[in-house]
Amino acid sequence: MFHVNAWGLPYSVPLSGARMVFPGAALDGKSLYELFEAEKVTFSAGVPTVWLGLLNHALQNNLTFSTFRRTVIGGAACPPAMMDTLIDKFDVEVIHAWGMTEMSPLGTAGGLQTKHLDLPKDEQRKILQKQGHAIYGVDMKIVDDDGKELPWDGVAYGHLLVKGPWIIASYYKNEGGDVLQDGWFPTGDVATIDADGYMQITDRSKDVIKSGGEWIGTIDLENLAMAHPAVLQ
């Protein structure tokens, strides 16, 4: 319960009248699958590495889920290949989410709008692969290196800044001094925002690679590697 998500699902689950199941230290694929089946889990949330182990176990043993129908994936970008497997192979709805400890913790949540329901599957999937809309109470914007705000066109990418009533203004004992930039908290992420307000993380500011005069996102490289059948992790 030390993690920031202790402020999220442990409150929202009982408020909705649902039962909560904790996996404890057993986070390997086999243990998780047996827990899901024994406790008839319908919804779960976790980081991609957790789902990687669970999916590998299910695929290698030709297993299906009897009750598991929805998952929220955050903490890192969900690889497209993983999302495809969850949706197409196991009929599990995937909700992409993003947040930070400093945001208490949720910032955005993904999902399709009504106008997207008639789009081809591959176009819908591209939307679901984004981190989603800002939740109620959270404002966001992207800026260039000079602090100039960039357009929401799905093409321009820049430093992601957020603000809201529960987003921190400073760290404990003011370590690091004033962290806000004109009232906005710098997340350290590089992102794009499209015309419909869908945000997509392209990288961490410190992780972007410059090659041949072009900036390359490490997330793109990771997704390409994860999509290869010979790559486990």
Kindly label every feature range from the protein language model:
Residues H116, K130-G137, K148-D182, E214-I216:
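Conserved ATP/PPi-binding loop(s) of AMP-dependent carboxylate-activating enzymes
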Residues T49-W51, C78, I167:
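Alpha-helix capping/helix-boundary segments
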Residues E37, S44, G164, S170, ...:
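AMP-binding/adenylate-forming catalytic core of the ANL superfamily
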Residues V143-D144, T187, I193:
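Hydrophobic alpha-helical segments, especially N-terminal targeting/anchoring helices
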Residues G75, G99, G132, D189, ...:
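Active-site glycine-centered loops adjacent to acidic/histidine catalytic or metal-binding residues
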Residues L15-A18, A38-G46, L55-K126, D139, ...:
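Gly/Ser/Thr-rich phosphate-binding loop
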Residues F2-T42, H57:
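Conserved AMP-binding/adenylation subdomain of ANL enzymes
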